[in-house]
Amino acid sequence: MLKLETIFHKEALLVQVDPDHNFLKAVWLKQPTSSEFRKYILLVTEYALARNIKIALFDIRRRSYMEYCDQNWTLKEIFPLFEGNFVKFAYLTKIEGLDLMDTLRLQEAQDNSTLQKTTFKIEHFLDEEQALTWLFE
């Protein structure tokens, strides 16, 4: 059973952690601007790296899309920071939104990148329980 502690709560993003399980959950509460997205993702990344977070659930159902420039920024600046660590990211999406398309692009780019696939995994889910099961297996 997860024991989530809120570490960050702003208008656009809620971040909770369970330090005992090296788990982070980030819930987008609204569509962020590009600058908000980058600022918050950088904060989450710095926290995850400093605390050795290995698994993360990103609930993006209230986020409509990710700007193309932010997708590229994430691939170029954020994902490489996790190289050498075993990390699993689960995206909780809704099937009718564009949010699924942009994170699928991230997953495809990650699958084709030079980062070792055995140490960095991304999957998409419509159901939170299924996402958590995958993250903790």
Label every model-predicted segment:
Residues L2-E137:
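Amphipathic, Lys/Arg-enriched alpha-helical "gate/interface" segment within cytosolic domains
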